[in-house]
């Protein structure tokens, strides 16, 4: 329940009272002077310390950023060098493989040519042997055949001439 005295007091607070304003201002100035004497220095010191801490953090952050950028540049350079080195290794590997392929191909061609030449030589030797054997057999058969024919009509000198003539004919046909 409200009394009339309470209402009066509330009304007086809302109306300006010069004495109250004066004492409030004096109290405010005294509190301000006390705060300046006692608390202003530590508050300013704390603010300055905080400012220094923030500035130090900013400086460290900038330094870390610069270091990170330097590391990033260095890493990019290393990556570029690694790429160049890998390209060089791949290129050298391809060149080596191509050289090796060429060497193997040349060696195979050389070996094949040697084998072909050797086979031709063997064939030629076998051909000569076969022709020699054939010539001897033909000569023997011719001698036998001629001997039979000539026995009846020729003597020994004539037989030798006929055989020599046949051998000569065979040799000239071969060459």
UniProtKB/Swiss-Prot annotation:
Keywords: ATP synthesis, Cell inner membrane, Cell membrane, CF(0), Hydrogen ion transport, Ion transport, Membrane, Transmembrane, Transmembrane helix, Transport. One of its GO terms (cellular component) is proton-transporting ATP synthase complex. InterPro entries: ATP_synth_B-like_membr_sf, ATP_synth_b/b'su_bac/chlpt, ATP_synth_F0_bsu_bac, ATP_synthase_B_chain. Belongs to the ATPase B chain family. GO terms for molecular function: proton-transporting ATP synthase activity, rotational mechanism; proton-transporting ATPase activity, rotational mechanism. Gene3D superfamilies: F1F0 ATP synthase subunit B, membrane domain. It is a single-pass membrane protein. F(1)F(0) ATP synthase produces ATP from ADP in the presence of a proton or sodium gradient. F-type ATPases consist of two structural domains, F(1) containing the extramembraneous catalytic core and F(0) containing the membrane proton channel, linked together by a central stalk and a peripheral stalk. During catalysis, ATP synthesis in the catalytic domain of F(1) is coupled via a rotary mechanism of the central stalk subunits to proton translocation. The keyword Magnesium does not apply. This is ATP synthase subunit b. The chain crosses the membrane at residues 20-40.
